[in-house]
Swiss-Prot record:
The gene is argP. It comes from Vibrio vulnificus (strain CMCP6). This is HTH-type transcriptional regulator ArgP. The keyword Ribonucleoprotein does not apply. Residues 4-60 form the HTH lysR-type domain. GO terms for molecular function: DNA binding; DNA-binding transcription factor activity.
Amino acid sequence: MRGLDYKWIEALDAVVAQGGFERAAEELYISQSAVSQRIKQLERFLAQPVLIREQPPKPTPVGKKLLGLYRRVRILEHELIPELMNDDTAKPIQLALATNADSLATWLLPALKEVMTLRQVELNLAIYGESRSIEKLKSGEVAGAISLESQPIAGCKADYLGRMDYVCVASPDFYQRYFAAGVNYQTLRKAPAVSYDQYDDLHNRFLHDHFNISRDSIINHNVGSSEAFVRLAVSGIAYCLIPKLQIEQELASGVLMDITPGFLLSYRIYWHHWQLESGVLKEISQAIVQYAQAHLPQ
């Protein structure tokens, strides 16, 4: 019986990564019909579909498992073959990691600086909410993920990184305009806030836990940039929850103020990665864990 042909999975990976058959064909330097034929051969071999044919195409649950396997093999292959052939001219290894925006805006890049400087690696740092990033590791789309989840998925490890502490801040002018009567249920419902996106529930959780306010009771902007949060708050457009680590200078100078002193939102974050790691991927995991544990509150 013929075994699994990795060219079939390569075609599946290209279709998903490029968002369609035409671009996948260009990526693989084959015809579009050849890409389609390889996908059909894979589905015939497995006796089930591996691709949801919509726009853009998406892998089925079985397709996700195959992509996870394929991408792991590619990483190991990329590291092993140059070593066996004593070839130091190989292309950089490509790695995708899932992170939340706040980690990227604060401590993650300094943690990765040495590895990115010394090793041949191209990183794709994909931003997802803390509760969604683990799904990308399950599907094989990324080789590691920062998550709120403490329990590892099958075949992976979860290392504790530290605590992210959030403070609710605004500019002094904004505070006088909206909170002259104090920060309470009534005033918070009239003041504009900002969240990262519709999946960001940190602000909602904070308001619900401390003021019993629901999301649909407030004025809320969605801005997909942690750095823009700071600018919006400093310019007096909105109030928001921001990692304390990100705005220590603004708090010290008085440009921003903690409008709910004594109320802090904290959560623990974890680095999820494959149990069997080697080479640059192992170095990345070690760098992330060591730096975070040294610089984040424990």
